Amino acid sequence: MGASGRWIKALVGFTKSDKSRSSKKDENVKVATKSRFGRKNSVDFDFEKFQDGFEDSNTRSMVDTGVSTSTSLQSYGGVAYDEQSRENRAATRIQTAYRGFLARRALRALKGLVRLQALVRGHAVRKQAAVTLRCMQALVRVQARVRARRVRLALELESETSQQTLQQQLADEARVREIEEGWCDSIGSVEQIQAKLLKRQEAAAKRERAMAYALTHQWQAGTRLLSAHSGFQPDKNNWGWNWLERWMAVRPWENRFLDSNLRDDAKLGENGMEQSENVPKTQIKSVSKMPNTSNLVSGVSSQMTGPCQSDGDSSSPGISSSIPVVSKAKSKPAKDDLAVEVNSRPGAGPRSHSNPKERSREPNRSSKERLSLPNSGKSLGSQSTKANRAGKLTPASQKVVEEKSAQNQRRRNSDPIKQRLA
């Protein structure tokens, strides 16, 4: 009994130690399970440690009991071991099944958690992506507006610059046109140009005197020639050449060069006043009896075309063909009538019959101003109208006209044409 009692005590002590160990393990397992998803029913069982402890206890008991009791102990230990091994196998199976259940539950929880995290993260990512896209759209709109504004400003600036350049170009062209209109393209100094223009003016005056002289002699020759002039007859030489000579005497292309020179010569007409006052009134009466032949020539000028270009110092051959042969006795009163006719013009003064080379030229003209030729076409028209009026007036009215013409002649003493030709 002593050996068996010790064996029982050893077995009881072993069970207590196993219980204490198992309780500690259970506490450890409970703490572990609490930390893992709040689980309470998980149990961990270390089978190898239990087997080692059991074998140690068996060896101790076998050493204590001795050889005498070995047979009885072997039989009893074999039965206990079989029972314990069955319990261990059953516990192992239970633990494996329970652990599989817990693992499957944890796996399901993890899968749900992963799905929840994926949903949350996907929602957050989609929300952040939407915010980013809105920001990008706003930035793109702002950039588009800025670029459109820059393009608009560039176009406005370009249009303004183009308008400014166009206005500047138009202004430059206008200035160049003005310069070209007042520009004298002839070669030579100012004095030479003025001398040439003066020669042309004197030649034009000579041509006018010659035409007036020819017209007076045509009137004195007879009335047949005047009746022939009543219609348009371009076959007659005197008809066309008289108009051409009058047109060449005007010289419209030189008017702009001689205007300034005639203004400068307005101060030199004091000597012309004496000559105009000495003209007798009888000569003025003879002019009033002349027929309206110059009016016929001025009326044809609107129908004739084809200007004839010739030099300023030479006369046309038509003058010689249109002038009839008369006696020297009749030439002197014709010249006097011509002088009266020239003096009675509204825009012309008394003209001298001397050679242009014999006249004295005044050097007081400005070298920078330009010369121009007077428009003799207008003076011829006004002359013809006055001649018609003078032919129709009565003797009483002729006196009034003569007095008015004398007053007008005094006023025209300062006329640049008369001063230049004096």
Curated annotation (Swiss-Prot):
Keyword tags: Calmodulin-binding, Cytoplasm, Cytoskeleton, Nucleus, Repeat
Feature: compositional bias, Low complexity: 310-327
Region of interest (Calmodulin-binding), residue spans: 137-151
PROSITE patterns linked: IQ
Function recorded in the entry: May be involved in cooperative interactions with calmodulins or calmodulin-like proteins. Recruits calmodulin (CaM) calcium sensor proteins to cortical microtubule arrays, thus being a potential scaffold in cellular signaling and trafficking. Binds to microtubules (MTs) and promotes MT assembly and dynamics to modulate pavement cell (PC) morphogenesis via cellulose deposition-dependent anisotropic cell expansion triggered by cellulose synthase complexes (CSCs). May associate with nucleic acids and regulate gene expression at the transcriptional or post-transcriptional level.
UniProt short sequence motif Nuclear localization signal, positions renumbered to this chain: 23-30
Biological process per Gene Ontology, one example term: leaf pavement cell development
Gene3D superfamilies tied to this protein: 1.20.5.190
Effects seen without this gene: Abnormal pavement cell morphogenesis in cotyledons characterized by reduced interdigitation associated with altered microtubules organization and dynamics and reduced rates of cellulose deposition in anticlinal cell walls thus correleted with a reduced anisotropic cell expansion. Hypersensitivity to the microtubule-disrupting drug oryzalin.
Comp. bias regions, Polar residues: 273-308, 373-387
Compartments (UniProt record): Nucleus; Cytoplasm, Cytoskeleton; Cytoplasm, Cytoskeleton, Spindle; Cytoplasm, Cytoskeleton, Phragmoplast
Main location: nucleus
Subunit structure: Binds to multiple calmodulin (CaM) in the presence of Ca(2+) and CaM-like proteins.
Tissues in which the UniProt entry reports expression: Expressed mostly in vegetative tissues including older parts of the root, cotyledons, leaves and shoot apical meristems (SAM). Present at low levels in pollen, siliques and seeds.
Protein name according to UniProt: Protein IQ-DOMAIN 5
Organism encoding this protein: Arabidopsis thaliana (Mouse-ear cress)
Domain IQ: start-end pairs: 87-115, 116-138, 139-164
Key word Kinase present: no
SMART domains per the UniProt record, alphabetical: IQ (SM00015)
GO cellular component: cortical microtubule; membrane; nuclear envelope; phragmoplast; plasma membrane; preprophase band; spindle microtubule
Segments of skewed composition (Basic and acidic residues): 355-371, 412-422
Extent of the signal sequence: none
